[in-house]
Structure formats: C-alpha cells, structure tokens
Design a protein with these regions (language model features):
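Conserved Rossmann-fold NAD(P)-dependent oxidoreductase catalytic core, especially the SDR/UDP-sugar
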Residues: 98-146, 156, 162
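Amphipathic terminal alpha-helices
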Residues: 291-325
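Conserved C-terminal active-site "lid" loop/helix of NAD(P)H-dependent oxidoreductases
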Residues: 261-287, 293, 304-308
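N-terminal Rossmann NAD(P)H-binding glycine-rich loop of SDR-like oxidoreductase domains
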Residues: 23-42
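Substrate-binding strand-loop-helix patch
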Residues: 173, 201-208, 227-247, 289, ...
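Alpha-helical substrate-binding/gating segment
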Residues: 183-192, 200-235
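Conserved beta-loop-beta element that borders a ligand/cofactor-binding pocket
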Residues: 151-173
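Mid/C-terminal beta-alpha module of Rossmann-like enzyme folds, strongest
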Residues: 216-267, 272-273, 312-325
C-alpha cells in the first residue's frame, strides 16, 4: 500500500476491541529496520514504512514511498503514535524528517532514534555509560560524530524523544558480513584466521531485544531519555567464532595472525574493543537472548538467504596474503 496525500489520519485506530497503534518506521527493507517493522506488524500495530521502494517491502506493512530528504506534504496528512527512526545517520536526516512531519499539528506522540555506541570517545574509561560525554572516536570517525549530531538535532526539536545506543547488532535478516562471514568459513571447512590470540572482547545485542526495548519505551514512557542497550556479558573473538562454528555443526580450528597492519582486511570487526554499561537497560528489559540461541536463529536465516548477504573480500585476502605465511 502506497500512501497518498489525503485527510489527516487519527492516531490509535480502534479495531476488534483494542486500540491499534500507528507506527512510522524509517527504512523497513534491510536488517534492523525490516526486523523492527515486521516485529511490530506481527504484534498487531499498523506499521507504515518510509522508503523509496527500491527493495521488497516487509510483510504486513503499509508503504509510504518517498525520500526522507524530499518529503513534501506526504507526511503532513498523517499522524502516528510513534516514529521509529532506524535509518538516521546525520543531523540532516533527522531535520528533514521532522520538517516533513510538520509542526502545524502534533503529528506524532513518541520518537525513538536508533543511535550507536560509536558516540563515545575511545579515550573514556570503560564500560561507557550514558552520563559520559560523547565525542569523536578514532575508530568510528564520521559515523560516530554524525550520530552525535543526529542525537543533538533530535533533542533540540523533540526534547522528550528517546535514543537507544546499541553495540554490534545481530540476528535474522543480518545482511552485514559478520556472523555470516564465520558461517561461510564454517560451512566450507576453512581454518579460521584469528587476530592475534583472539582475546579482543565483543559486545552484541539481538535485534529482537532491541525491539523489546522499543516496545517497553512505548508502553511505559520511562523518565530517562538515553539508553545504552546490549548484552551484559562480552565475549572474546575466539569464543564468538567457536560459537558460530558450533552453531553450524563444526569445530573451529585456528591460525593466529600477527603483524598485519589492518585486521579489517581479513576479519569482520575493527581492532577496537569497547563495552557499554547497560545497567540502565534493566528499566526496559530484564533479560536478553543468550548469544548461542541468537546465533542459531541467525544461522537458520543465513542458510536460506545466503544471496542476501553483502560479502566482503576477507576470504580472498586470506587466500592471497595469509595462507602462504
């Protein structure tokens, strides 16, 4: 369904004895935004996805076909219980969407922005907490600073908005070449090339747990406005790879890589260890999906959607540069 301009819609439609929330999800066609759109649609919400219609649309949703930077009046005829902004990476992304929503009438009740743990400078003591100052992180560069500016732009115009800062997201629909890279190695029986001793720590968060956090915010409207979200426990690279191999029914064998200038050439994470303090998250959810369980879900999706993964040249680099070492 493509939305056209028309009479201004009412928020919270009464249907079959209950109110159905109207949710606007930016994106909706790839990994996180698609999972979120489908998650809330399955819950019975009326989910509207805002994108340019270049990819298949998520199930049980309504399409608003538009570029968020050139919205015209298409959203000014709509009202939503919540805007779930999954695809804002810059201040302009936020400002253009808010301009498109309009200010003449209150067009939404809640606004939830998915930001990132990349907003914390690497020089701060870890784990990073929401009360620490944000700033440039040398590892994340413009990605992190742009997310900071997006947060600032939002709070300037919508002081009661909510911001979630996750670490590495994973789960079904993940087309980013992370767990899928390890699954590729496992399925092909490759020795895994491990950065140094493999003790670098990684922090993950299942995309369904992210949805649960959003759901809690919309239901309870907590007083805090910024939440770090993520699994409480970090795992080493080695532990994570072993879990991925075991999920694929294999046992990992390792080669240790030393002296390569950039591990990004052959591995799916930067040489950077960070951890978020997720104590405040307990106000939203009290448990998270165990990593082993989440990876099983991710592997099942991967097995049926290998062609949807955006692969990088890690295996080619390993074959050409590392196997002969």
């Amino acid at each position: 369904m493509t939305i056209k301009s028309g009479a201004k819609a009412f928020v919270s439609v009464w249907k079959e004895g209950m109110y159905v929330r109207r949710l606007l999800v930016t994106g909706g066609t790839v990994f996180v935004s698609r999972f979120i759109a489908e998650y809330f649609a399955k819950k019975g919400d009326a989910v509207y996805v805002l994108n340019r219609n270049h990819r298949p649309q998520p199930a049980q949703t309504r399409l608003i076909e538009a570029d968020r930077h050139h919205l015209g009046d298409i959203l000014k005829q709509q009202s939503f219980d919540a805007v779930l902004d999954i695809t804002a990476y810059t201040a302009k992304d936020v400002d253009d969407l808010l301009d498109g929503l309009g200010t003449l009438h209150r067009s939404f009740q809640d606004y939830v922005l998915i930001s990132s743990g990349a907003v914390y400078p690497e020089t701060l003591p870890r784990p990073f907490s929401e009360t620490q100052q944000t700033g440039e992180n040398q590892c994340w560069g413009a990605y992190g600073t742009n997310k900071i500016e997006a947060e600032k732009a939002l709070f300037k115009r919508v002081p009661n908005a909510y911001v979630l800062r996750p670490p590495y997201l994973y789960g079904p629909l993940n087309n980013v070449y992370r767990e899928a890279f390890v699954f590729d190695c496992a399925d092909s029986g490759h020795t895994f090339y491990l950065p140094r001793n493999g003790e670098m720590k990684l922090q993950f968060f299942h995309v369904r747990d992210l949805c649960r956090c959003i759901e809690a915010i919309l239901a309870h409207h907590p007083s805090e406005r910024i939440y770090n979200v993520g699994n409480e426990t970090c795992v080493s690279v080695r532990e994570w790879v072993e879990l991925c191999y075991r999920t694929a029914g294999r046992t990992a064998e390792f080669a240790h890589v030393h002296g390569v200038r950039s591990q990004w050439e052959y591995f799916c994470f930067h040489d950077y260890e960070y951890q978020l303090d997720v104590t405040r998250q307990s106000e939203l959810i009290t448990d998270t999906i165990p990593l082993e369980e989440g990876l099983r879900e991710a592997y099942l999706w991967y097995c049926g959607h290998k062609e949807e993964v955006n692969r990088k040249g890690y295996l080619a680099y390993i074959d050409e540069q590392l196997r002969a070492i």
